Amino acid sequence: MAGSRGAGRTAAPSVRPEKRRSEPELEPEPEPEPPLLCTSPLSHSTGSDSGVSDSEESVFSGLEDSGSDSSEDDDEGDEEGEDGALDDEGHSGIKKTTEEQVQASTPCPRTEMASARIGDEYAEDSSDEEDIRNTVGNVPLEWYDDFPHVGYDLDGRRIYKPLRTRDELDQFLDKMDDPDYWRTVQDPMTGRDLRLTDEQVALVRRLQSGQFGDVGFNPYEPAVDFFSGDVMIHPVTNRPADKRSFIPSLVEKEKVSRMVHAIKMGWIQPRRPRDPTPSFYDLWAQEDPNAVLGRHKMHVPAPKLALPGHAESYNPPPEYLLSEEERLAWEQQEPGERKLSFLPRKFPSLRAVPAYGRFIQERFERCLDLYLCPRQRKMRVNVDPEDLIPKLPRPRDLQPFPTCQALVYRGHSDLVRCLSVSPGGQWLVSGSDDGSLRLWEVATARCVRTVPVGGVVKSVAWNPSPAVCLVAAAVEDSVLLLNPALGDRLVAGSTDQLLSAFVPPEEPPLQPARWLEASEEERQVGLRLRICHGKPVTQVTWHGRGDYLAVVLATQGHTQVLIHQLSRRRSQSPFRRSHGQVQRVAFHPARPFLLVASQRSVRLYHLLRQELTKKLMPNCKWVSSLAVHPAGDNVICGSYDSKLVWFDLDLSTKPYRMLRHHKKALRAVAFHPRYPLFASGSDDGSVIVCHGMVYNDLLQNPLLVPVKVLKGHVLTRDLGVLDVIFHPTQPWVFSSGADGTVRLFT
């Protein structure tokens, strides 16, 4: 018996641990009578038959006693079997051979059943089912995006990608022609199409429906608890404790030593005992109980009752007493629709007034209103009025601009309606209702020449070209072109040569205006041409190049605006129909645009394309004046309802800013050709100069700042300043008024 035990200990390491541990679980329940074939090894293990070796006894004892003494054999095998295996390797090899011979010669039903249940250990291995046509391994296929192949096969050859990728048309044709298109997928490892089998399709459908992939799997099998609810006297496992469990741990020793050192150094303090009494946070600890504001901070007083009126008097006036018809109508109304909740009555004296019948009802409704209706505290926003004013720069930082009156040009006997300055800024021309044009020297206020025109001068404009000395004046139904012969004589002579070089065509075309040469007497005064329209002319303005001029006529229809060409002496009407009464026109300084201001709108026309580009809405009752910024992207309009409107053509067709600084109607507006200034003249006798900076950055809005109010004109016939114009080079402004004077502010 001892020999068999020793042999069993020696042979224990040669047996696979997995199989020995799994045999008690896979072994069926013990039967009352074991088979006869399994009893022969037991007799050999007792030593009755001397023909059986010790190795055979150890093998059979290990197979048979695995259910009872498995733990003891394992422990003993762990301690003693290692030395035996190291000392005598040949002996263990003989024991393995003997064990195989004994198992083959003496089959045991228990052993056969266990081996049949264990089976092949690779039966559950699914690695053989993997597709190994592409042998690149478990690497990302994105590594092969820049290569013509996707991997390598078993022979090491490259697996090339398809020559042409399928587009949507190929997919559509496959969907229509291939009956197995719906069960075809693309293999990412090889790039080829795979057709799913019926079993794979059924598996996909089961997974999509939320079922298990295995058909024979039952997720609702009855569960068998390994541990029963009955208390047993024997433990589940009787394995003795390890030897290392009786030896103190060195790691714990180091931890304890560190904790002891921390306690000595005072780094670890014992926990303070908690106070078992509950602590509550005092909400009103910071409140002063004696402060009236603290106690009544959130108090909202109840709304007061309305005071009684005359209808509630015991002796009301007769007009408050209802007639019989009014009383019947009051009784037929709903209680909520009645203006009065009672009928006014009249009593001879106060002591004759009976008790009020609705007193209790009204007190009850008052109590309901007090405790059911929520009260709301309206927070008043205290806004400083200074914060509402936009932060603008100081006017002294925006200089230069005109600040005071420098000169007064006197000579006209009636109101001066229009002004114009020569391109060089040396001469000034003014038109008046006294029927004369006066030419002034700007620096000295001396009247150089007076030209009688025989009518009211509505508008005057100096040619902006420095190579031409020509003045256009609108007098009644004609436009007079005069050569003042001021300044350079060569320029004046070249102007006469330019006008006299015109050769009229043999067949003059039909035009809306007539071009007439001046007589000898008129030429001595300076008149060169006369353009007759047949209708009163209200405005004349030059194009920037000096060859075209636009005229506004006081008539109805599409001929309100005419454009004249000086070099060819031609006139034309640019519009086919009218859009209201035209007030002012202006040429764009840089583009072929014509701005036409009617009473309620400003239209921007493209002359080359002959189309409407934009329509500006000033939101004014009556537009009176118009001016275009020298850059051409901004427009200002004045109106008779004392508004000045600034338009940004790149921003919107609505006003960018509306200024209401004047108290009466605006008569004229003007931009300075060089400085960021614009001015407006009004019937209140003042000229307001504003700083208008336009930035090159389109994301930055223009800066508009009023800088100066200039006064000096005397109101005459309820008229003040009639025209305003800037000096072309200096920050000066000219103004003409109804008092018959022209004033220069510098």
From Swiss-Prot:
One of its GO terms (cellular component) is chromosome. Its main location: nucleus. It is found in: Nucleus, Nucleolus; Nucleus, Nucleoplasm. Residues 88-99 have a biased composition (Basic and acidic residues). Induction: By MYC. Residues 66-87 have a biased composition (Acidic residues). WD repeats lie at residues 411-450, 452-492, 532-576, 577-615, 618-657, 661-700, 716-746. It comes from the Eukaryota. Pfam families: BOP1NT, WD40. PANTHER family: RIBOSOME BIOGENESIS PROTEIN BOP1, RIBOSOME BIOGENESIS PROTEIN BOP1 BLOCK OF PROLIFERATION 1 PROTEIN. Component of the PeBoW complex, composed of BOP1, PES1 and WDR12. The complex is held together by BOP1, which interacts with PES1 via its N-terminal domain and with WDR12 via a high-affinity interaction between the seven-bladed beta-propeller domains of the 2 proteins. The NOP7 complex associates with the 66S pre-ribosome. The PeBoW complex associates with DDX27, BOP1 interacts directly with DDX27. Component of the PeBoW complex, which is required for maturation of 28S and 5.8S ribosomal RNAs and formation of the 60S ribosome. This is Ribosome biogenesis protein BOP1. It comes from Homo sapiens (Human). The gene is BOP1.
